[in-house]
From Swiss-Prot:
One of the primary rRNA binding proteins, it binds directly to 16S rRNA central domain where it helps coordinate assembly of the platform of the 30S subunit. GO terms for biological process: translation. This is Small ribosomal subunit protein uS8. Pfam families: Ribosomal_S8 (PF00410).
Amino acid sequence: MSMSDPIADMLTRIRNAQMVEKVSVTMPSSKVKVAIAQVLKDEGYIDDFAVKSEGAKSELNIVLKYYAGRPVIERIERVSKPGLRVYRGRNDIPVVMNGLGVAIVSTPKGVMTDRKARATGVGGEVICYVA
């Protein structure tokens, strides 16, 4: 059976792995998932990630980050879903926790944070909030 929302599955795997204090989490890979992982790494929410290809299937392995025994990601929440897509213009991109968190946005110029999208002057689909 096919998965209806692979990005929500990725976020749930990260959330569940951090609740049981796993070092890393593995999931099926895609270009969008790798782009989201890159944003999470650039923002300091994860330590590292790697894509392992075996034949036709590739897997994304994310090394999770903890500080003082607690997960760095306190909240990770899907915003735009397959049943209800959420698009925002460059002036309407939300601010998460007054700038302490980030909104990950898929724009025509690639997947980026809300701050970078505002600075670049582009809007797009709000994928998730991370805090």
